[in-house]
């Protein structure tokens, strides 16, 4: 991570005093965080801590009751999720959620609804650069893939729109450590090659401090640096 990596020395994403939740009930309280271009930030916490809600607030799929979310120095609180996608934010949800009856290729295309048909092949090749096995299996039904390969499809689908910010929800869930290594290595390469920012939500037991630039902890709806929690 470097402040100069985006030329302007300005964070890609800023959250200031954000409150968000469901059906009028707040789950997040005065959340403050920033993400710089080209860095990986891991957001860790237990079940029900608010990790998923925070990613969805950034993506625009839950209600934001207060505070401000800024992306590329634009206030996006009122933007619909599809507008955020067009602006460069992409989401890989928990549980991978691939379309089991569709091929790998078709699953990837599902992440490229705003991409001209003439560009789909090139976009797929971009994905295969980081996940070569998907290129060899692009005509295979996603439901027949291993859990690790399905996770690669989910992240690849998020890459198809060529985002500047990728939100990844619990990519380690249910995967062997060696597979998790490959997934994180691919995310690191994507950050370096494309100056993409990545925010990963993980459980505490899946925390990989050495594979990211910063760790933030979410507890009872608020976010604190991992280092400050470790000192308490």
Which residue ranges define each predicted feature?
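ABC-type ATPase nucleotide-binding domains, specifically the catalytic core motifs of the NBD
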Residues: 23, 64, 104-122, 130-135, ...
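The feature captures the beta-strand-to-loop junction immediately N-terminal to the Walker
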Residues: 44-46
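Helix-to-loop junction immediately C-terminal to a conserved catalytic motif
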Residues: 59
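Conserved ABC transporter NBD signature motif
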Residues: 67-75, 87, 120-122, 225
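Conserved ABC ATPase signature
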Residues: 141-145, 149
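ABC ATPase C-loop
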Residues: 158-159
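H-loop/switch region of ABC-family ATPase nucleotide-binding domains
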Residues: 201-203
């Amino acid at each position: 991570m470097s402040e100069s990596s985006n030329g302007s020395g300005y964070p890609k994403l800023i959250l200031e005093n954000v409150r968000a939740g469901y059906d009028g009930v707040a789950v997040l309280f005065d959340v403050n965080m920033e993400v710089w271009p080209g860095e990986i930030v891991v957001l860790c916490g237990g079940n029900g801590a608010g990790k998923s809600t925070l990613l969805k607030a950034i993506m625009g799929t839950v209600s934001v009751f207060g505070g401000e979310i800024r992306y590329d120095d634009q206030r996006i609180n009122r933007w619909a999720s599809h507008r955020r996608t067009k602006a460069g934010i992409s989401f890989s949800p928990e549980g991978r959620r691939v379309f089991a009856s569709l091929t790998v290729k078709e699953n990837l295309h599902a992440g490229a609804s705003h991409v001209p048909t003439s560009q789909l092949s090139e976009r797929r090749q971009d994905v295969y650069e980081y996940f070569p096995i998907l290129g060899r299996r692009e005509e295979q039904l996603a439901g027949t893939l291993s859990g690790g390969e399905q996770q690669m499809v989910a992240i690849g689908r998020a890459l198809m729109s060529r985002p500047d910010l990728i939100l990844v929800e619990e990519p380690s869930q249910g995967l062997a450590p060696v597979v998790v290594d490959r997934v994180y290595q691919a995310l690191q390469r994507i950050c370096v090659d494309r100056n993409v920012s990545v925010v990963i939500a993980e459980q505490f037991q899946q925390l990989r401090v050495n594979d990211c630039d910063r760790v933030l902890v979410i507890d009872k709806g608020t976010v604190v640096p991992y280092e400050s929690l470790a000192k308490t």
